[in-house]
Design a protein with these regions (language model features):
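Hydrophobic h-region of N-terminal signal peptides that target proteins for export
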Residues: 10-20
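Bacterial N-terminal signal peptides that target proteins for export
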Residues: 1-7
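Amphipathic, non-membrane alpha-helical segments in soluble helical-bundle scaffolds
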Residues: 45, 73-76, 126
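Short, well-ordered, aromatic-rich surface patches in folded extracellular/luminal domains
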Residues: 19-38, 42, 91-224
């Protein structure tokens, strides 16, 4: 691997790590997708697939947008109990494979001790850890009558040097795009009204360089 290629790889890895490294305040459990739904997407910029907070507030995300709602105390406690049960499974650790399939998810458990688990395979085709597969399926498909569209107050800028097919757009935010190369910076939602958000990236021209930029929605109290 040449020095230029190695540097680019480390740059992208650092940005991805920073994008998924922050904690959501008061979270009980968070599920994030680590695989792109479509070619060219930036999976680390997609909103979390599922978030449950200690007060029963819940967020459900897709490729770019989120819905927010609130669970009854009994509903939240049921999910918490299932999480406790999963923690006690034999073979449960930092990385598990459920079975076949290219899917990769990050399960972030926060209540009762922080623990991040990379889960590989399609939970619908699980051959091991059925309780974990069942929980993951429930959270990935989660629906609730209280859910309403969530409008974030800010976004995290995830950027890397590169090009996309077609033209590029002018950078319109106050802080230079290069400031987000090693660690995402936040921008107000009001300034991002005409930008694609979530996993769908934009091509940006700034000076003599071009960047691939994605805006990840931030939850209340979350920092990039």
């Amino acid at each position: 691997m040449g020095k230029t290629t190695a540097a680019a790889f480390l740059l992208l890895a650092a940005a991805a790590s920073a994008a998924t490294g922050g904690d959501i305040p008061k979270a009980v459990v968070v599920v994030e997708s680590l695989t792109a739904t479509l070619p060219g997407q930036v999976p680390e910029a997609a909103p979390p697939r599922f978030v449950l907070l200690e007060d029963g507030q819940v967020f459900v995300g897709g490729t770019s947008r989120l819905a927010a709602g609130r669970l009854a105390k009994a509903e939240a406690k049921d999910i918490e109990a299932r999480v406790v049960g999963v923690r006690q499974l034999p073979g449960f650790g930092p990385s598990v494979t459920l079975g076949p399939g290219p899917q990769r998810h990050l399960l972030r458990l926060r209540k009762g001790g922080a623990q991040d688990i990379t889960v590989e395979g399609d939970p619908a085709q699980a051959t091991t850890l059925p309780a974990l597969a069942s929980l993951l399926q429930q959270l990935l498909r989660f629906d609730h009558p209280s859910l309403r569209p969530y409008h974030p107050g800010s976004y995290a800028v995830i950027a890397r040097e590169g090009k996309l097919a077609g033209g590029c757009r002018r950078w319109t935010f106050a802080e230079a795009v290069s400031e987000s190369l090693f660690a995402p910076r936040s921008v107000p939602a009001a300034d991002a009204e005409n930008w694609p958000t979530g996993a769908a990236p934009a091509s940006v021209c700034a000076g003599d360089k071009t960047y691939v930029v994605a805006l990840r929605p931030l939850l209340p109290g979350e920092r990039p």
